[in-house]
């Protein structure tokens, strides 16, 4: 399913002395099956933008077309049930939203609200949990006896198991150890590729943005200032400084080596594996 923003603006507390325009005249198309990253400083409008993707927020002006349904400030909630099933959001620190006394009950909660087949959902959740390193008795375990990182994984799986077409992740790996972070991000990329899902990642981690995303949307002061593939984006050092966006570590390393040896690699590496290959090829030529 595709999602299209048409000149969308959103104002918090409109008509009061505290009104604030969080996003301004945003037009954006998100295509089925792609992995998008949305980046920008805190306060740039990222969270407001993603809450329009399944109509948790409705535009103050403009419209959002979600799989053919035109959402405006006049759209009634009763028309949005299907959209909210097909567009799943994992909010920042989702573990704070857990409340059931077993993983199984936690997994069942969302699907019950949408009258989904619980066996299918639980089977899918169980396989995902095994891929994330849980033991086979995980479904009967209490989330509240687990570490913060394990609770985060449970919360993420509870959304993935409902099989939404669009998966939105707001800082999903914040606070996770490196191994857990790799497990989660690799699983999400696998789901995108194998199941043709649309992934929308909000992140301050430029290493993840470079490694996993197909396209990057840059927000600044409530507007979209750039939409590009990560390789092109991270070549724009001057603009990135202006937007207060860090380079990925591997890009910094490559730039340092190019400067030190007064040379240029044929392309910008987006992950460590790419860089090692480029470096070996260059070193062999030398």
From Swiss-Prot:
One CC-aspect GO term: ATP-binding cassette (ABC) transporter complex
Source species taxonomy: Bacteria, Bacillati, Bacillota, Bacilli, Bacillales
Any single Pfam family the record assigns to this protein: ABC_tran
Chain's role: ATP-binding (A) component of a common energy-coupling factor (ECF) ABC-transporter complex. Unlike classic ABC transporters this ECF transporter provides the energy necessary to transport a number of different substrates.
UniProt protein name: Energy-coupling factor transporter ATP-binding protein EcfA2
Organism: Staphylococcus epidermidis (strain ATCC 35984 / DSM 28319 / BCRC 17069 / CCUG 31568 / BM 3577 / RP62A)
GO molecular function list: ATP binding; ATP hydrolysis activity; ATPase-coupled transmembrane transporter activity
The enzyme's E.C. designation: 7.-.-.-
Family membership: Belongs to the ABC transporter superfamily. Energy-coupling factor EcfA family.
Assembly and oligomerization: Forms a stable energy-coupling factor (ECF) transporter complex composed of 2 membrane-embedded substrate-binding proteins (S component), 2 ATP-binding proteins (A component) and 2 transmembrane proteins (T component).
Localisation per UniProt entry: Cell membrane
Membrane-topology annotation of the record: Peripheral membrane protein
Record-linked NCBIfam families: ECF_ATPase_2, PRK13646.1
InterPro entries, A to Z: AAA+_ATPase, ABC_transporter-like_ATP-bd, ABC_transporter-like_CS, ABC_transpr_CbiO/EcfA_su, ECF_ABC_transporter_ATP-bd, EcfA2, P-loop_NTPase
Chain sites annotated for binding ATP: 40-47
The entry's keywords: ATP-binding, Cell membrane, Membrane, Nucleotide-binding, Translocase, Transport
First-tier enzyme category under EC: translocase
């Amino acid at each position: 399913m595709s999602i299209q923003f048409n000149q969308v603006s959103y104002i918090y507390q409109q008509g009061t002395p505290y009104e604030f325009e969080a996003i301004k005249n945003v037009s954006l198309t998100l295509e089925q099956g792609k992995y998008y990253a949305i980046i920008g400083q805190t306060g740039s409008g990222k969270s407001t933008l993603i809450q329009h993707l399944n109509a948790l927020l409705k535009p103050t002006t403009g419209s959002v077309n979600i799989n053919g349904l035109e959402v405006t400030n006049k759209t009634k909630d009763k028309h949005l049930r299907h959209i909210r099933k097909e567009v799943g959001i994992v909010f920042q620190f989702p573990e704070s939203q857990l409340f059931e006394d077993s993983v199984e009950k936690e997994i069942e909660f969302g699907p019950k609200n949408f009258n989904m087949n619980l066996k299918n959902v639980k089977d899918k959740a169980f396989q995902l949990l095994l891929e994330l390193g849980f033991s086979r008795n995980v479904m009967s375990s209490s989330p509240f006896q687990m570490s913060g990182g394990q609770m985060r994984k449970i919360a993420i799986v509870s959304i993935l198991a409902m099989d939404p077409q669009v998966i939105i992740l707001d800082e999903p790996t914040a606070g996770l150890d490196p191994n857990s972070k790799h497990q989660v991000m690799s699983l999400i990329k696998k789901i995108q590729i194998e199941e043709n899902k649309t992934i929308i990642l909000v992140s301050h981690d430029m290493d993840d943005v470079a490694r996993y995303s197909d396209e990057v949307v840059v927000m600044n002061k409530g507007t979209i200032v750039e939409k590009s593939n990560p390789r092109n984006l991270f070549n724009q050092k001057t603009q990135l400084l202006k937007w207060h966006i860090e380079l990925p570590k591997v890009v910094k390393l490559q730039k340092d080596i190019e400067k030190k040896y007064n040379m240029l690699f044929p392309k910008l590496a987006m992950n460590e594996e790419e860089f090692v290959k480029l470096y070996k090829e260059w070193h062999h030529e030398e």
